[in-house]
Amino acid sequence: MDTGVIEGGLNVTLTIRLLMHGKEVGSIIGKKGESVKKMREESGARINISEGNCPERIITLAGPTNAIFKAFAMIIDKLEEDISSSMTNSTAASRPPVTLRLVVPASQCGSLIGKGGCKIKEIRESTGAQVQVAGDMLPNSTERAITIAGIPQSIIECVKQICVVMLETLSQSPPKGVTIPYRPKPSSSPVIFAGGQDRYSTGSDSASFPHTTPSMCLNPDLEGPPLEAYTIQGQYAIPQPDLTKLHQLAMQQSHFPMTHGNTGFSGIESSSPEVKGYWGLDASAQTTSHELTIPNDLIGCIIGRQGAKINEIRQMSGAQIKIANPVEGSTDRQVTITGSAASISLAQYLINVRLSSETGGMGSS
């Protein structure tokens, strides 16, 4: 593969996102941030590191290609140093390879793997690096992890070739829709379920109201501020700031705010059932029904794979949700939500989260 397109200073601003564990990130940051500061100054690349209360963190490198790969090489060298240090008093017979994970849009993985795996095989053979593309997307995102292992130079060459493939794919067929970036979850985050009970999430599952942007490997603005929510066992939960706001609204029996802006979906913003009390406490509330109209091309994100998402929404809200069969000639599907006013409101909220994540319609509060 010709990596001259990278070596020759291609006129693009490249962004590489790495997924690392906290200990690795700590080493890269260094004492009082001295190590990462040195990397920034010597490479000329922008190096951003996601918030520190997560077991996993995203390191984003952005800038001209020569700056990016200089910073990348410095990170690889640092990881290599850490392995050498750990081997000093070790009785292990073999030295482990440097291993890292790239985070890339799932839409690019097909081109990267190639027909029958030919492209990924070519990259492995030409660079000597071990490369594995994850089969599943990272939680609550449209991105996958690519694990690369080997000696430093092999890894650097491998990442260059991966970027070349992605650049070529972009130039031939620009992506459709948005990329929902992966956001590692905090290790302990207050959440609330229907019924009012507080919990703290400590597992590996999380959900986010992501900063959605039509970004690929080349977007320098990928690290925008997220709007976060958290999950336990894969179920949506309401973040604490929103919880306080919604609790106040419930006490005032005011209308539930469905969106931060106009979604264009009939029945979602215009219809807001009154919240009659704190969620889950009014078990004897009168059962009512509410109908939504959702475009056919978005109904899939509400249903989820094998109905997983719609079942989450049902369990979280306590509402019954029925999606009508498609009607010939119609571009919309009818969704009927039945339950108490509070459960309907929560179901609407969760549906709107799914739609906003899919379309990028969620603004900042």
Curated annotation (Swiss-Prot):
Q: Cite a single GO MF annotation.
A: ubiquitin protein ligase binding
Per UniProt, the keywords (alphabetical) are: Antiviral defense, Cytoplasm, DNA-binding, Host-virus interaction, Immunity, Innate immunity, Isopeptide bond, Nucleus, Phosphoprotein, Repeat, Ribonucleoprotein, RNA-binding, Ubl conjugation, Viral RNA replication
The organism's place on the tree of life at top rank? Eukaryota
Spell out the residues of the site Cleavage, by viral proteinase 3CD: Q253, S254
Cross-link Glycyl lysine isopeptide (Lys-Gly) (interchain with G-Cter in SUMO2) position reads K115, K185, K322
Keyword Cell membrane listed? The answer is no
Tissue pattern of expression reads: Detected in all tissues examined.
> Which ranges carry the KH domain?
13-75, 97-162, 287-351
Q: Where does this protein reside within or beyond the cell?
A: Nucleus; Cytoplasm
Stored PROSITE patterns: KH_TYPE_1 (PS50084)
Major location (coarse):
nucleus
Q: Name one GO biological process term.
A: innate immune response
Q: Does the keyword Ribonucleoprotein apply?
A: yes
Q: Name one GO cellular component term.
A: focal adhesion
Q: Which residues carry this modification: Phosphoserine?
A: S173, S189, S272, S364, S365
CDD domains tied to this protein: KH-I_PCBP1_2_rpt1, KH-I_PCBP1_2_rpt2, KH-I_PCBP1_2_rpt3
Q: How is it modified after translation?
A: Phosphorylated. The non-phosphorylated form(s) exhibited the strongest poly(rC)-binding activity. (Microbial infection) Proteolytically cleaved by picornavirus proteinase 3CD.
Summarize the protein's role: Single-stranded nucleic acid binding protein that binds preferentially to oligo dC. Major cellular poly(rC)-binding protein. Also binds poly(rU). Acts as a negative regulator of antiviral signaling. Negatively regulates cellular antiviral responses mediated by MAVS signaling. It acts as an adapter between MAVS and the E3 ubiquitin ligase ITCH, therefore triggering MAVS ubiquitination and degradation. Negativeley regulates the cGAS-STING pathway via interaction with CGAS, preventing the formation of liquid-like droplets in which CGAS is activated.
Can you quote the domain comment? Answer: The KH domains mediates poly(C) binding.
Subunit organization: Identified in a mRNP complex, at least composed of DHX9, DDX3X, ELAVL1, HNRNPU, IGF2BP1, ILF3, PABPC1, PCBP2, PTBP2, STAU1, STAU2, SYNCRIP and YBX1. Interacts with IFIH1 and RNF135. Interacts with MAVS (via C-terminus) and ITCH (via WW domains). Interacts with CGAS; preventing the formation of liquid-like droplets in which CGAS is activated.
Query: Do you know which PANTHER family this protein is assigned to?
Result: KH DOMAIN CONTAINING RNA BINDING PROTEIN
- From the Swiss-Prot or TrEMBL record, give the protein name: Poly(rC)-binding protein 2
* Organism listed in the record: Homo sapiens
